[in-house]
């Protein structure tokens, strides 16, 4: 779940 959240945040940024 951690890596997935990181990817989502990177997508927004």
Curated annotation (Swiss-Prot):
The lineage of its organism: Eukaryota, Metazoa, Chordata, Craniata, Vertebrata. GO terms for cellular component: extracellular region. Its main location: secreted. The modification Leucine amide is found at residue 13. Expressed by the skin glands. Keywords: Amidation, Amphibian defense peptide, Antibiotic, Antimicrobial, Immunity, Innate immunity, Secreted. Belongs to the frog skin active peptide (FSAP) family. Temporin subfamily. GO terms for biological process: defense response to bacterium; innate immune response. This is Temporin-1Tp. It is found in: Secreted. It comes from the Eukaryota. It comes from Rana temporaria. The keyword Secreted applies.
């Amino acid at each position: 779940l951690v890596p997935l959240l990181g990817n989502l945040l990177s997508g927004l940024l």
